[in-house]
Amino acid sequence: MGYDDRPVLRGVDLAARRTEVVAILGANGSGKSTLIRAALGLVPLVDGQVRLFGTPLRRFREWRRIGYVPQRLGAASGVPATVREVVSSGRLARRGFLRPAGAADRLAVDAALIAVGLLDRGSDPVGTLSGGQQQRVLIARALAGEPELLVLDEPTAGVDAASQQAFAGALADFVTRGGTVLLVAHELGLLEPLVTRAVVVHLGRIVHDGPVPEPAGHHAHPEHDHVHPHAPDSSGMWQ
């Protein structure tokens, strides 16, 4: 796929399987975020096809099965709402807009808030939370919908260590319950132990698909926390 006749992704052939935690890694501008946006139908394809849970994208309607947290989107977004109200909106795809919230919805929202460590902040305005806490609210919103596939675009970018630890715990619980995670990252940080498979994108092409690449040279120094390769190696749920 591409923008204005400029190719962004070329020759991508990729599938994610149930209970995998797949990290899409690469430098800024490599095409990794575009890859997952194309997989969700958020940007059009010039050629090729996408299948979600075995169904061609154009016929897929079961969006409640997917939870998506986009890149750098504040949970407040200018709307005066509490943490619980934002997280509760994640139930709409599952219960519908016309049916009022029931006991199952409230339990799911509580479970999502507990998973990200924000149950005690449920009545607080989202705008009063830190950036990392707002990102945790967005992940809780996605979890509240009880998806089977969780798609996260740079969820830990610029957030504090406590929030990263909360993300890691929430994702570990999600996978334990049979969920699948597709994660875009520039750095994995505390999420690295959860990753079962790493896909490295370089100049719009997949150049590595396997274990998380080991850092090399000065990037392997203990004080350097990069986990992605800075040059390409030689080397389902959606595809």
What role is predicted for each listed range?
Residues 146:
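Conserved catalytic motifs of ABC-family nucleotide-binding domains
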Residues 150-153:
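Catalytic Walker B motif of ABC-type/P-loop ATPase nucleotide-binding domains
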Residues 185-186:
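H-loop/switch region of ABC-family ATPase nucleotide-binding domains
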Residues 48-62:
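Conserved ABC transporter NBD signature motif
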Residues 125-129:
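Conserved ABC ATPase signature
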Residues 198-211:
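H-loop (His-switch) and adjacent beta-strand-loop-beta switch element
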Residues 88, 103-121:
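Conserved ABC ATPase "signature" region
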